[in-house]
């Protein structure tokens, strides 16, 4: 069994995928498994996926018809064998030593979920990327029956993305990404549901991940269809947040 399974949903990523994969391969983590789910790409992504798998035995490739990032992540989770799971977008990268830090924290604290800091770069109109500064929170922990404020944890750990977190795989059994969330918010829905399952979560402010927000990303789309898609995602998000808060929040929160 692998120690960590890294799931990469890939769509038309022939120019960025290798960099993302190499940022994972450079991590000092034994028994690493990388699962690339080619989500119906129409460029050379499929060829690159199989070339990488031939080059590195720890890489496994799944090819499916285009169904979106949520469906691709779900396929990857079904195939994952690692004790822990994390995610990487096909145009992002992990900082050197990030997975070792997340894993060491999980093992030292016996947490089911460890969340780190991240760096966000947003694409400008000229195509270049600019860093979007955001303050890091303070280290914090929540554990059932042992205290810790859920509200303070969310405030310190910031927006609840999946790519800067490490999850114990057994804590996620049966949990899936909501495939109705096709224009963003899917990470927030997933994490709210995950907080209903974990017994302990830890946040560390050290940056572990660099995320590139492309102007072409579906989460940045401003069409009427995209707006309606985000509105539809609010209901499952609020429902998941309500149940998570019920589990973690005491009367004082």
Predicted feature descriptions by range:
Residues 23, 38-48:
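A conserved acidic beta->alpha catalytic loop
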Residues 31-40, 60-65, 89-90:
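Short beta-strand/loop segment that forms part of the nucleotide-sugar
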Residues 85:
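Short aromatic/hydrophobic "clamp" motif used to bind/position activated sugar donors
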Residues 64-80:
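Glycine-rich, basic loop-to-helix element that forms the pyrophosphate-binding segment
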Residues 22-31:
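Short, acidic, metal-binding catalytic loop of nucleotide-sugar glycosyltransferases
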Residues 90-205, 209-226:
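Donor-binding/catalytic cores of nucleotide-activated saccharide
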Residues 1-5:
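Extreme N-terminal starter segment of soluble prokaryotic enzymes
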Residues 13-16, 41:
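Donor nucleotide-sugar binding loop of glycosyltransferases
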């Amino acid at each position: 069994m692998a120690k960590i399974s890294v799931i990469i949903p890939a769509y038309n990523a022939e120019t960025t995928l290798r960099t993302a994969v190499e940022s994972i391969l450079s991590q000092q983590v034994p028994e690493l498994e990388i699962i690339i789910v080619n989500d119906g790409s129409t460029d050379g992504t499929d060829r690159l996926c199989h070339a990488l798998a031939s080059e590195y035995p720890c890489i496994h490739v799944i090819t499916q018809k285009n169904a979106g990032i949520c469906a691709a992540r779900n396929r990857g989770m079904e195939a994952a064998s690692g004790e822990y799971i994390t995610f990487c977008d096909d145009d992002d990268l992990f900082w050197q030593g990030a997975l070792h830090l997340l894993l060491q924290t999980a093992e030292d604290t016996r947490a089911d979920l460890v969340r780190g800091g991240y760096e966000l770069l947003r694409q400008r109109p000229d195509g270049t990327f600019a860093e979007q500064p955001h303050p890091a929170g303070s280290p914090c922990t929540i554990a059932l029956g042992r205290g810790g404020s859920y509200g303070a944890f969310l405030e310190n750990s910031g927006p609840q993305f999946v790519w800067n977190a490490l999850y114990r795989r057994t804590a996620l059994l049966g949990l899936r990404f909501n495939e109705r969330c096709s224009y963003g918010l899917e990470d927030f829905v997933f994490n709210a549901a995950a907080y209903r399952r974990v017994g302990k979560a830890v946040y560390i402010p050290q940056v572990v991940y660099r995320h590139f927000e492309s102007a072409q990303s579906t989460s940045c789309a401003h069409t009427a269809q995209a707006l309606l898609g985000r509105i539809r995602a609010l209901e499952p998000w609020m429902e998941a947040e309500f149940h998570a808060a019920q589990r973690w929040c005491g009367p004082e929160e």
